Amino acid sequence: MRFSKALIAASLGIVLCLFGPSVSSGSAADSGYPRLVPPGSGTAAGASPPSIRFVTADDFPPFNFIDGSGLITGFNVEVARAICTRLAIPCTVQIRPFPLLLDAVRENKADAIAAGVADTPALRRHLAYSVPYFREPARFVRRWPALVEPSPHSLSGKTVGVIAGSRYADFIGDFFPAAKLHPSSSEAELFASLKSGEVDAVFTGAVGASFWLAGPVAKGCCAFSGGAYTEPAYFGDGMKIAVAADNTALKGSIDSALRALDADGTLADLALRFFPESLY
C-alpha cells in the first residue's frame, strides 16, 4: 500500500480527538463495505488452538499503532483480537520491529503475524497466509463541485494526478488512456496538486485519501468521486494473517474465524472504527 504514515498519523490524532476511539459513524449495514471472504474459501477449520500469540509492529497507523493510553491497537490488532473472541480462546499481542516479525514465528516465539506482511513466493517458503480480511481499494478524488462519475469519456483530456511509477498510474494508463497523467513523487504533493487545481482529479489508495479528506489540509475542498476499484492484478489481494508454513491447523482456525467475522459484519464495523469514512 502506498500512503504516507506521517500524513495518516497526524490525521488520525485529529480524528480520534474529534470522535473518540470509534472514528467513524454508521454501521456495517450502511457502509457499503464488501464481503471479502467467499464462503468455503481458505483452509477448513479443525479444533481451535488453546491460545494464539500474535505479533505486530507499532508504526503503521491506522493498522497497528500505540494509542494515547500507551496500548497497542489498530485495525490489524483488533482483527486479531476479534479472531480470538470468535474462537473463544485467549490471545496475546506482542510488539516487534517489523523486520523481526518473521523471525518471531520461525523461532516459535509467536504463532501468527497481524501486520500486513506481504504475500510473496519468497515468504511462502516460511509462512502460510489466511484468507484476506482487508483490501484497500483505489479511488478517484476530485474537488467540489466537479464530482461527475469518472469514466474514460468524462476523463478524456482531463489531468489525473498519480504517484509516479505506481500501480495507480498503470491502471489509469491501461483503462483511461485518454486522460493526461500528472505524476507526483509523494502523497503530499499529489493532494496539493488537486487542491490547487493543477489536476482535475487524483487516483490513489483510499486509506491515505480518506485521512487527507478528513484532515485539516483539505479543508473540505474535495471528496471521493465514483466507486471503488479493487482489481487484484493492480491492487493486490488484500491483507492476511501469516502463520508458520506448516501450521495448517492454526491457519484453518483463523480462516474459519475470518469467514465468520466477515459474514456477521465485524470486519466492516472495525473498518468503520479505524477509517474516517467508508473506503468504498
Locations of regions flagged by a protein language model:
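Membrane-interface motif at the C-terminal end of an N-terminal transmembrane signal
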Residues: 21-24
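Bacterial N-terminal signal peptides that target proteins for export
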Residues: 1-11
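Proline/Glycine/Serine-rich low-complexity intrinsically disordered segments
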Residues: 15, 26-280
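Bacterial N-terminal signal peptides
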Residues: 9-19
